[in-house]
């Protein structure tokens, strides 16, 4: 198995950032799904509700999160945040997150919705499924890392009238040189002497098509 691509998605349900190397932390790859958009009640907002979020392009530089989108001025934010907190929800999980008021006007202008951009610090607990471990999560759906095989997607595309790109699956680690769907049977993988448990298949949503 060879790793061919590394990706993070700093703002949940927005564009990804391809990396040449990544820092692995307690909650997964550094800055992956560490920000997200919520409505005034703290409920997660995704491309299901606002498809144009696909064109929001985050990037990380020095101590800033930079954001761009078509017909919008560039936005720069401090990577960490302090100040007002808000109780937010990712599916069935509730947690405290910092509100970034300086981003509110920008995202409301782009989405034409009342939204807040929030940030989850390492100090905010969000335990993963206790059947899988004791780690805490960012704003990911369920697990710290998502892997996918190029050969599995290639085999899938051989049976589709309209192929789907690897990027549609929004995985963190993309690898090659494995039999199609071999990852479905794995319980552990090792990368540079670091061992990872493979818990479950990731259920993808309508964003695939």
Predicted segments with their positions:
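Metal-cofactor-dependent catalytic cores
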Residues: 1-209
